[in-house]
Amino acid sequence: MTTPPQAGVFPAILHETHADEFVQPFWDAAKKGKLVSARCTNCGTFRLPPAPFCFECQHREIEWVELPGTGRVYSFVIVRHALAEMLQPVVPYASGIVELDGTQGAGSRMIVNFVECDPEKLQIDDRVEAVFERVNDEITVVRFRPSK
């Protein structure tokens, strides 16, 4: 018998990852409570999500850059209807896009879930900060909450 999820907490099964060589450093950093992004060594464009080539110049080499873990709400949606029964306890919740501080270019935004907030009070341009939710020994998920 499985324990039902708590309100606002997504079931662990939704966090299974199958990281490849391009994204593994992101997950390794998250386990340490750090937000990182790949950056093109040729033109400086950020690659989030990490990809095998640069979105701007198609260069292949990257460097991993630690980001401050802050940003602003660029866009969001409030999910009010569970798409699966296991999600019923967590609705409503907010998902959206954060424009990350310390980045520029095509990969400067990240799709996220917002936590520790009333979704109805979330606003475009709100300042937010990363929080790291340890799901298990292998997976730590990056979420965002309103800045304090």
Report each predicted region and the residues it spans.
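Residues immediately within or flanking Cys/His clusters that coordinate Zn2+
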Residues: 34-37, 51
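Well-ordered alpha/beta subsegment
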Residues: 103, 109-148
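Short coil-to-beta-strand transition motifs
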Residues: 63-72, 124-126
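A broadly conserved sequence feature marking short terminus-proximal activation segments
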Residues: 1-35, 147
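Glycine-rich active-site loops that engage anionic ligands at enzyme catalytic sites
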Residues: 74-116
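Short, cysteine/histidine-rich loop/knuckle motifs that typically chelate Zn2+
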Residues: 39-42, 53-59
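Short functional micro-motifs and their immediate structural scaffolds
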Residues: 48, 62-63
